[in-house]
Amino acid sequence: MAADEDELNLLVIIVDTNPIWWGKQALKESQFTLSKCMDAVMVLANAHLFMNRSNQLAVIASHIQESRFLYPGKNGRLGDFFGDPGNALPDCNPSGSKDGKYELLTAANEVIAEEIKDLMTKSDIKGQHTETLLAGSLAKALCYIHRASKAVKDNQEMKSRILVIKAAEDSALQYMNFMNVIFAAQKQNILIDACVLDSDSGLLQQACDITGGLYLKVPQMPSLLQYLLWVFLPDQDQRSQLILPPPIHVDYRAACFCHRSLIEIGYVCSVCLSIFCNFSPICTTCETAFKISLPPVLKAKKKKQKVSL
């Protein structure tokens, strides 16, 4: 029991709040809306905090022009509601309850609801960049995990994982930043899980495969909560004892640097490893001039002259 108390489990949930994708869902009169998605996320967050008093939580909204922490909020501090009553907000009573609700979870739900409402009402779409800033959200999650690991006591161990709830399509423009974040997470032994609502994500498939996480495309979006609790609530140690969805085939195609499109066969710069779909004598990334190798020229053999007698 002491070993469990000395181990901290930090779960960072990244929610895709792309207003264009969720707006299309509303136009389709779909039963699954952003508010229902956030309800499922908050149930997962509450269940994670209930699993152990030392469990920690963070929720990030991945928007089209920014990445914002929904929990802890703007006034939150590292350690708020994380099993440390000394760091709780003044208005929160850790041992009390209100209307049958646990105060810490009630405060967390209120903070998340307030932040997501503020984000969606104040969002202003400018320009043609309407892709979700997923790579930036993952980088922010890694920074938060690194900061949380510095606050861990010497006799404690912290295990961290990131859950991405993806809605909109992938952005090939973020390919390089995305791959850098994936390898940084792998180096820090941080799992990246992915729960995809709509079309498959090749980038998240690679992220889950490289870091050892789980990738799941939800068959029915209204059943999101059941899949979150079944697949993504258990941590890495508990998953080995459960029957989980089988692994999927990973799309390892790379995005070219010239058009940002996924390709199967391309040209790679031998200096900076940039990938291009068409041959270019000069690398546009590092400006290296390539030597074009021509087929070897075969010299004609000299005919031996016969000596006349």
Curated annotation (Swiss-Prot):
One of its GO terms (biological process) is nucleotide-excision repair. It comes from the Eukaryota. It holds the Pfam family Tfb4. It is found in: Nucleus. Keywords: DNA damage, DNA repair, Metal-binding, Nucleus, Transcription, Transcription regulation, Zinc, Zinc-finger. A zinc finger (C4-type) spans 269-286. GO terms for cellular component: core TFIIH complex portion of holo TFIIH complex; nucleus; transcription factor TFIID complex; transcription factor TFIIH core complex; transcription factor TFIIH holo complex; transcription preinitiation complex. One of its GO terms (molecular function) is zinc ion binding. Component of the general transcription and DNA repair factor IIH (TFIIH) core complex, which is involved in general and transcription-coupled nucleotide excision repair (NER) of damaged DNA and, when complexed to CAK, in RNA transcription by RNA polymerase II. In NER, TFIIH acts by opening DNA around the lesion to allow the excision of the damaged oligonucleotide and its replacement by a new DNA fragment. In transcription, TFIIH has an essential role in transcription initiation. Part of a TFIID-containing RNA polymerase II pre-initiation complex that is composed of TBP and at least GTF2A1, GTF2A2, GTF2E1, GTF2E2, GTF2F1, GTF2H2, GTF2H3, GTF2H4, GTF2H5, GTF2B, TCEA1, ERCC2, ERCC3, TAF1, TAF2, TAF3, TAF4, TAF5, TAF6, TAF7, TAF8, TAF9, TAF10, TAF11, TAF12 and TAF13. Component of the 7-subunit TFIIH core complex composed of XPB/ERCC3, XPD/ERCC2, GTF2H1, GTF2H2, GTF2H3, GTF2H4 and GTF2H5, which is active in NER. Belongs to the TFB4 family. This is General transcription factor IIH subunit 3. It comes from Rattus norvegicus. The gene is Gtf2h3.
